[in-house]
Amino acid sequence: MSLQAVIEAAFERRAEITPKTVDVETRVAIETVIEKLDSGEYRVAEKIGGEWVTHQWLKKAVLLSFRINDNQIIDGAETKYYDKVALKFADYTESRFAEEGFRVVPSATVRKGAYIAKNCVLMPSYVNIGAYVGEGTMVDTWATVGSCAQIGKNVHLSGGVGIGGVLEPLQANPTIIGDNCFIGARSEVVEGVIVEEGCVISMGVFIGQSTRIYDRETGEIHYGRVPAGSVVVSGSLPSKCGKYSLYCAVIVKKVDAKTLGKVGINELLRTIEE
């Protein structure tokens, strides 16, 4: 059977799979997928024909990986850990770090099966299994990149940002942050929301599938997707009865790539009333 066929068949009987009962073919298939996700050869989601496509069988392999290993001691410099998933950098040498070309600041944690591209900087942060972090991206202090999340090139995830995963609670599709996006401090993007290329999300903005994303120029309301080039802040919209307001994210303006390249992030956010 093909790698995908083995994974699909195993997922159908996942409740029966334990570290003691898993057969060799299934274990090898799962571990092969994790290795290919780790190297960036496979991605849980990718853009095909201009649209994001989720490879569900790869996500299933990530889920299955939790079924085939017992918890074990993991050495972590000043302490120890006890988990089923190995750490990505456990066997890295100085030459391998140099070859792969990214920086990892002490206390940053990346699980095996996550891909980190060249010129990335990982401050003390957390990147979960199956995630993809594109070239030139900064994952700032206390930011978290959830399981299978897809982060584009030249993205800045500011301090304390949370990008949701697919494992807990179980989600159909990963959260996606497009190329050249800025996600402000303490913001959360979860539940498979897609933030398209070149967006600027202000600090403290929370976006899930049920969050109304209101475009103040057009009056249009989006769900689950922030259009390319949007500058977004937190806000509220009045209820139908007019007695209260409910949270929303507000698109205050649109910028193209040229403007984004010339104008600082702070300037874009300071001029939202124009």
UniProtKB/Swiss-Prot annotation:
Protein name per Swiss-Prot or TrEMBL: 2,3,4,5-tetrahydropyridine-2,6-dicarboxylate N-succinyltransferase
Cellular localisation: Cytoplasm
Highest taxon of the lineage: Bacteria
Family as reported in the entry's similarity comment: Belongs to the transferase hexapeptide repeat family.
Annotated NCBIfam families: dapD (TIGR00965), PRK11830.1 (NF008808)
Binding site for substrate: R103, D140
Organism encoding this protein: Haemophilus ducreyi (strain 35000HP / ATCC 700724)
Keywords: Acyltransferase, Amino-acid biosynthesis, Cytoplasm, Diaminopimelate biosynthesis, Lysine biosynthesis, Repeat, Transferase
Pfam families per record: Hexapep_2, THDPS_N_2
Subunit structure: Homotrimer.
A GO term for molecular function: nucleotidyltransferase activity
Pathway membership: Amino-acid biosynthesis; L-lysine biosynthesis via DAP pathway; LL-2,6-diaminopimelate from (S)-tetrahydrodipicolinate (succinylase route): step 1/3
Catalytic reaction annotation: (S)-2,3,4,5-tetrahydrodipicolinate + succinyl-CoA + H2O = (S)-2-succinylamino-6-oxoheptanedioate + CoA
GO annotation, cellular component aspect: cytoplasm
